[in-house]
Amino acid sequence: MDPTAPGSSVSSLPLLLVLALGLAILHCVVADGNTTRTPETNGSLCGAPGENCTGTTPRQKVKTHFSRCPKQYKHYCIHGRCRFVVDEQTPSCICEKGYFGARCERVDLFYLQQDRGQILVVCLIVVMVVFIILVIGVCTCCHPLRKHRKKKKEEKMETLDKDKTPISEDIQETNIA
């Protein structure tokens, strides 16, 4: 007997109580673990409330890994833009689309391929056009053949009708038995 079937003798009240207790405990456990509240601050970060503190905080100089290329590397990148790696003291290239390599000297042949969606649409159109041409070609070839077969069949029926001898209904009875 299925305990979850309607009309079963097993009550679902204990199951519901266990689920409710589990949800209550879970809510208490993770209530502060994942929150979107902003942390409360007892005082202002700048000092006096309402004070503009953007000018008083010292700006830190942002250190980057790259800088502009020196003039001696002006034509270093063949198909791209030059940048200078500060830590290594070497030039590097940011290649234009369709090129790759250390100096952007190689052509990326896969870049020349169009979007796959466009290729799919073009292929479907070509397949439909070929299918239509094929159907028209088959119909054009089959129609004269069908006419020719029909004409031959009619001629054959005419010759059969001419060769056919009429069957007489006169049957003579003989007493052979």
From Swiss-Prot:
Key words of the record: Cell membrane, Disulfide bond, EGF-like domain, Glycoprotein, Growth factor, Membrane, Mitogen, Secreted, Signal, Transmembrane, Transmembrane helix
Signal peptide: 1-31
Parts of the chain on the Cytoplasmic side: 140-177
Biased composition (Basic and acidic residues): 154-167
Residue ranges of domain EGF-like in the record: 65-105
Residue ranges annotated as Extracellular topological domain: 32-118
Glycosylated residue positions: 34, 42, 52
Entry annotated with the keyword Signal: yes
GO molecular function: growth factor activity; receptor ligand activity; transmembrane receptor protein tyrosine kinase activator activity
Coiled coil (residue ranges): none
GO cellular component: extracellular space; membrane; plasma membrane
GO BP term, example: apoptotic process
Tissue specificity statement from the Swiss-Prot or TrEMBL entry: Found in several mouse tissues including kidney, uterus and liver, as well as in beta tumor cell line and MCF-7 cells. It is not detected in the brain.
Stretches for region Disordered: 153-177
Propeptide cleavage-removed residue intervals: 112-177
Origin: domain of life: Eukaryota
Transmembrane segments: 119-139
Disulfide bridge map: 69-82, 77-93, 95-104
PROSITE patterns reported for this sequence: EGF_1, EGF_2, EGF_3
Subunit comment: Monomer. Interacts with EGFR and ERBB4.
Function summary: Growth factor that binds to EGFR, ERBB4 and other EGF receptor family members. Potent mitogen for retinal pigment epithelial cells and vascular smooth muscle cells.
UniProt protein name: Probetacellulin
